[in-house]
Amino acid sequence: MSTQIDPRGPRFGAAITSTLLAVTVFLSLDAATLAASHALLGVISVSFLWGALRGPANHPYGFLFRKLVRPRLTAPKELEDSAGPQFAQLVGLLVAGTGFVLGIFGVTAGITIAAAAAFFAAFLNAAFNYCLGCQIHVGLKRLKVIR
């Protein structure tokens, strides 16, 4: 059973993630900073892994949100099930992790493409409150592919 979370928490995390992914894309465009972009994509992949395994409430960004941001906000109008955002973290892990592994095998364009794709999804969530991974989760539940 998943927990109920403040829906603003994952958006806060998506804002941090989209910033890191934008830096990753920028660094991946120059051969001199390609190694740094690869390392940063690895760190982001670990962050996605943490969120996929532990859920958004137990993610470091969730901790930062609870301690630094939420006390300054009014109570949320409603809570959301954490299953969708947790699934979105898994999708992020698959995308970013693929780019990281491709980078290990010398496919450096994979770093840029994966980081850009993950940035697109994270930015949609942060800026427009549209969680692409959550929508995939809902679609797969409707198709009865997952529970």
Segment roles from a protein language model:
Residues 1-147:
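Membrane-interfacial helix-loop segments of redox and metal-homeostasis proteins
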